[in-house]
Amino acid sequence: MALMSALTASAYAQEVKYIEAPKFEGQIYLYGEPDKADVEYEQWYEIQNRGQFVRNVKVPALIPYLPEESKANGAAIIIAPGGAFLHHTFGSGGYEAAEWFRSQGFAAFILKYRVEITPREEAEYQKYVADKMAGYRAGGLSGNYAPATPDYAYEDINAAVKLIRERANDFHIKPNRIGIVGFSAGALMAVYNAECAPLECKADFIASIYGQLVMRDMPDKLPPMFAAMSSDDELSGQSGFEIIQAWQKRGIVELHLYGQGGHNFGMGHEPFTNSLWPAEFLAWLRMIGMINAPANEAKIRLNNGLDMPQYAKPTDLAHTVRQQNRHMMQSLRH
């Protein structure tokens, strides 16, 4: 499934400016050296106040944002942008996320996964999107516009985890400290990976950021999941929380439901409290022992029988990280 994020008429009422494809240092193709024509088929563009987008992606790749070795915390984050599997939103849920996670010591990778091939002319593309949305509404899906997720998107997220795990030494990370942070459609990929991927392709933790929480048949054990969304999100906020209750029985899960902020808030929009999710996510990772775990960690036994590291005063940590996060976001946006 996918969410029709950033595809509303209001988004496209603004001027669309097509640009040359950015040159990414160290870009890693998932399946070997690609055909040049397939790479050049991508279409990159900008929308005022919304950042960069790319559509017609035929060749999946990882775009690395690696920290200085002295600052590395040993963990990796794969960032899966949103865009309804029709495009990628590379602004706050792409570049900004990668820069922030790198600043916190993570080896960050933006996953440019394959998306649906759409009309190249802008007017035809807008009509194509409008027709799709009309079809979803006519199908009785209310605010949750959820077409089928392409199998190749799932293949790409699994391949990305496997590649990074196999090259853990190259990236100065631990092979059991690889996570996925997915935004909107990318969040669906993260949840799918946690539920369905083979062991060698499965992430060690995931974050679902304003993703629709879709209930599937679940395995007995699941990796830790952090979920964040706004209660007024007309795309994802109405899907219910059955999956959260089911996850509690199979693993560690934390849900942050913010009162306002809508959909597509990326790394957070001040003054909304969703601007705190990166700091809360970082504190959560420390609490569950994914980063900065002490050598002689104490354990607490959860109701579901799982052991979890226990740390002193996690609220103090969260407060400190929130302050750091606020300063970082301000510097990135100016």
Whereabouts are the PLM-identified features?
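Alpha/beta-hydrolase active-site loop
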Residues: E124-N169, W277-E280
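Short beta-strand element of the alpha/beta-hydrolase
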Residues: N73-G82
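C-terminal catalytic histidine-bearing segment of alpha/beta-hydrolase fold enzymes
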Residues: I252-H334
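Short amphipathic alpha-helix adjacent to the substrate-entry channel of hydrolases
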Residues: G91-I110, Q245
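Short beta-strand/loop motif that positions the catalytic acidic residue
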Residues: F226-M229
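Primarily recognizes the serine-hydrolase "nucleophile elbow" in alpha/beta-hydrolase
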Residues: D151-L222
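Conserved alpha/beta-hydrolase "acid-adjacent" motif
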Residues: E234-G240
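N-terminal cap/lid segment of alpha/beta-hydrolase-fold proteins
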Residues: E15-K71, S103
